[in-house]
Amino acid sequence: INGTLHKGRTNIAGEWGHHTLRPDGNECYCGKQGCVETYISGPALEKRWLELTGRIESLQAITKQTPNKQWKMEFLDNFGTGLANVIDILDPDVVVLGGGVSNVSFLYDEGWHAVCDKVFSDSVETPILKNKLGDSAGVFGACLLSN
């Protein structure tokens, strides 16, 4: 905020992956249920793919093909809901995706529309961009901001 890293009173600000997306949802390693991370992280998406198709595949392999319709619809719904909550609370200038999920190309068009369908405002202009530093961009950014 105002050019400084906001850590929050107890240093947990920004833990979007542990925001509750689905109450009584999937169990998370943090001990809670329904965390964003249990639905839209690479491992969670691969696990759901296995449940729907019976096939073990990487997120990269899944998205190189035409994904299972139910898998893709669930992914977009969860992505839209989760990110709309962040946008409604913070109203950021831009959202930059990091990690393996940032390599899912349809998130930058279909994902953006899924967010727009769920965000409070009728005029959403917050762009969703791919990071320029690879899967570990968030780690690099956090290091830079913490100095």
Region annotations inferred by a language model:
Residues 12-21:
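Short, intrinsically disordered, charge-biased short linear motifs at domain edges
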Residues 1-2:
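A cytosolic small-molecule/anion-sensing beta-strand core signal
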